[in-house]
From Swiss-Prot:
It comes from Rhodopseudomonas palustris (strain BisB5). This is Argininosuccinate lyase. Gene3D superfamilies: Fumarase/aspartase (C-terminal domain) (1.10.40.30), Fumarase/aspartase (Central domain) (1.20.200.10), Fumarase/aspartase (N-terminal domain) (1.10.275.10). It is found in: Cytoplasm. It catalyses: 2-(N(omega)-L-arginino)succinate = fumarate + L-arginine. One of its GO terms (biological process) is arginine biosynthetic process via ornithine. The lineage of its organism: Bacteria, Pseudomonadati, Pseudomonadota, Alphaproteobacteria, Hyphomicrobiales. Its main location: cytoplasm.
């Protein structure tokens, strides 16, 4: 005869393999705080509705508080034989308060219980991630203000394209992080409905108040359909999708740091705080933190793909497949959290090699577009013609092995006789970046204005809490 809480109709004990594949406590133990909070709200509602006595609800609440303290202090023994966090808590509650513990599960199933727990858990993840990204943004903005005039090469195809400022480059990631935060905030809005009280799938015949438990747990409202409440994990998928996009942004920045710190490039330097050495090569300083951020992106994307595959073929309502929704997601969330904190640390630590940046910004004829723009503005030349003329001049400079501003004026005039000495003034990298004053451009005054606006915005967010 089975000794499981669900074992009334079973005559044989589960096979050892069945026990092993069915157990989830190693993963869902991380939901203990959410499980206890939901159970306390449920018990209070049951008492308010006259379904259980006020005394039983009081004892249940005290017992749950004791369990919360025990787990927090590391004094709670999780038992694999009890399968999951729900039964581990309920079993210990019975030890503490006796038969009244059995009343807690009235008008509730593990199906709506775990859906509620996991929504609460993911909601906490969303709030923590938003706060971490705000710190990341602040670090970027502060460094951008510091380097609003630090000239560096801008790239396309990993080839020198046009001069930009280091501050402008950093502010690009502020904007990406803002969209990431927006996606997380949007996901939170859709997540914030309570499944509690949906029971197994069809609701319950008890006169429960789902609005009361939803309010108690900080949800906006109860979910409107009991089948939907226990069947879907789209709130996890949406959060993992936003997390994957965020991780890709971090990975791109990490990739740049890896490239820039290479001695062959040498645009930036990381301190010993964010580098490691080699066990055989004494000279090495490896950008391992950036490399690991890049790698952890795979963990986040993998978690999304894994859960999509779990969910894709499941008919309504709950299926045991959905027990596999947590481990990958939790690992993905943890990987993203660590990546954000690591990138925040590297942003604060990174030192731009300003002389090298300035020199690199002038390589590859990066101010060629400025010459083409001068031809358009001064000679009223159509841009396509100006592009063609400038291309020929770049070809002459490349053939002579000189920078664009080093090419003699007479050789430029051999291509276009109307070019005057005034054109040479636009060929410096400083002139180039200062001229990019269009909204969103790299001009230092733009970068400062944007960064200051972001600082005010972040400070306002912090005050509002």
């Amino acid at each position: 005869m089975s000794n499981k809480m669900w074992g009334g109709r079973f005559t044989d004990r589960p096979d050892a393999i069945m026990e092993e594949i069915n157990v989830s406590i190693d993963v869902d133990r991380h939901l203990y705080a959410q499980d206890i909070a939901a159970s306390k709200a449920h018990a209070a509602m049951l008492a308010a509705q006259g379904i259980i006595t006020a005394n039983d609800a009081k004892n249940i609440g005290k017992g749950l508080d004791t369990i919360l303290s025990e787990i927090g202090a590391g004094k709670f023994t999780f038992k694999r034989a009890l399968e999951d966090i729900h039964m581990n808590v309920e079993s210990r509650l019975a030890e503490l308060i006796g038969p009244a513990a059995g009343r807690l599960h009235t008008a509730r199933s593990r199906n709506d219980q775990v859906a509620t727990d996991f929504r609460l858990y993911v909601r906490d993840v969303l709030d923590e991630t938003d706060a971490a990204l705000a710190s990341f943004q602040r670090a970027l903005v502060e460094r951008a203000l510091e380097h609003a005039e630090t000239v560096m090469p801008g790239f396309t195809h990993l080839q020198t394209a046009q001069p930009v400022t280091f501050g402008h480059h950093l502010m690009a990631y502020v904007e990406m992080a803002a969209r990431d935060r927006g996606r997380f905030q949007d996901a939170r809005k859709r997540l914030n409905e309570s499944p509690l009280g949906a029971a197994a799938l069809a609701g319950t015949s008890f006169p429960i108040d789902r609005h009361a438990t939803a309010k108690k747990l900080g949800f906006d409202r109860p979910m409107a359909n009991s089948l939907d409440a226990v069947s879907d994990r789209d709130f996890v998928l949406e959060t993992l999708s936003a997390a994957s996009i965020c991780a890709v942004h971090l990975s791109r920045f990490a990739e740049e740091i890896v490239i820039w710190t290479s001695p062959l490039v040498g645009l930036v330097r990381l301190s010993d705080k964010f580098t490691t050495g080699s066990s055989i090569m004494p000279q090495k300083r490896n950008p391992d933190a950036a490399e690991l951020v890049r790698a952890k992106t795979g963990r986040v994307i993998g978690a999304l793909n894994g859960l999509l595959i779990v969910m894709k073929g499941l008919p309504l309502a709950y299926q045991k497949d959905m027990q596999e929704d947590k481990q990958g997601a939790m690992e993905g969330f943890a990987a993203l959290s660590l990546a954000i904190r690591a990138m925040t640390g590297m942003v604060r630590d990174i030192v731009p090699e300003q002389d090298r940046m300035r020199a690199a910004a002038g390589e590859g004829y990066a101010t060629a577009t400025d010459l083409a723009d001068w031809l358009v503005r001064t000679l009223k030349m159509p841009f396509r013609d100006a592009h063609h003329v400038t291309g020929k001049i770049v070809g002459l400079a490349a053939k002579a092995g000189v920078a664009l501003h080093e090419l003699p004026l007479k050789e430029m005039q051999a291509v276009e006789p109307k070019i005057s000495r005034d054109a040479l003034a636009v060929l410096s990298v400083e002139s180039s970046v200062k001229s990019r004053t269009s909204y969103g451009g790299t001009a230092p005054k733009n970068v400062r204005a944007q960064a200051k606006a972001w600082l005010k915005r972040l400070e306002k967010e912090q005050k509002l809490g």
